[in-house]
Amino acid sequence: MEQKLLDSKTIFKLKILEELSEHDVVELDDLAGKLGLPGAEIALIVDELKNNYLIRVENSNVTWLPGDNPARIKPWGWNYVYRPLVGSTMHVARRLSPWSIVVSEYQLHGYGRHGKEWISDLGGLWITFKFSLEERIAQYLPVALPVILCEFLREKYGVDAKIKWPNDIIVGGRKLVGVIIEGEYFRNRLHVYIGIGVNVNNDPKLERAVSLKQILGRMTPRNRIIAYFSGVMGRIEKYLEDHGKLQARYLELLETLGRRVAALILGDGVIIGKVSGVTETGDIILDTGTEKLKLSSTEIYELRYL
């Protein structure tokens, strides 16, 4: 794994967030003393944090609004872990029991499908859920999760969210949410890991990405999102019952449907065709003109529009 180093300013921002997560109010002078920086420099760093977090400064007192501070939420029925800095929330979750949540402000080694780098800017929401499911139910997660995420964004924020196969959530052609699904067998059940990255109040570095802040023109308290996701994941088996209905809604939201694409196959070249459908378990159906192929997200490294 390539070593990733933090710049000094990001380190101090994370230290400040750690202090604010543990206290209702922190004085600028106290932060300067604890971090060993001049007060003026601390004030500048806090001012920068205000661009990505719901942080207020009044009379030299710094507060992080509880609705945006992940340390202030305790989802019922979950083992909840908040750590400002981690290698990967997925890796932390692997050492925890099922029905655990891991939230972080920054991941040094966040990753998506096939190990691709997952950029975790400050101000976003980087979260992993670990729970236990029967395999026959778990197979419908790749279709259910994008639908659940799209519906949430549409209903709560009025965002025209759509799905880019297999499970990216896009707005105006730019990525707003990414999802990774992993699992491991334990006896007759699966331990499922759902990693979700939401560009909330961060400023994405990639032009093909977008944040809620950029779309709405305002900051969004992240704990509302954590609370909703926690509630849904706690009842996930109920959501997966009507997988036929989920598949139909997935296809309605699928921006990839009907497009001509190039599918980069792991170790086997490129397949060009038109996306004609998706199965109940999330496999894509490509019409090459001579045949229809069913391909899974584990087989396709990347899907490019033509």
Residue ranges of model-derived segments:
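Conserved, helical-rich catalytic subdomain that frames metal- and/or nucleotide-binding sites
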Residues: 215-271, 276, 305-306
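General small-molecule cofactor/ligand-binding pocket signal
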Residues: 81-83, 162, 296
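Conserved RNA-binding domains used in RNP assembly and mRNA/RNA metabolism
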Residues: 17, 259-306
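N-terminal lobe of the biotin/lipoate ligase/transferase fold
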Residues: 2-154, 220
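Nucleotide and nucleotide-moiety/phosphate-recognizing core
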Residues: 120-222
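Short, acidic Gly/Pro/Ser/Thr-rich loop/turn segments
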Residues: 109, 200-203, 283
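A generic structural motif
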Residues: 105-107, 170, 182, 262-266, ...
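Conserved beta-strand residues within beta-sheet cores
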Residues: 99, 105, 166, 176-178, ...
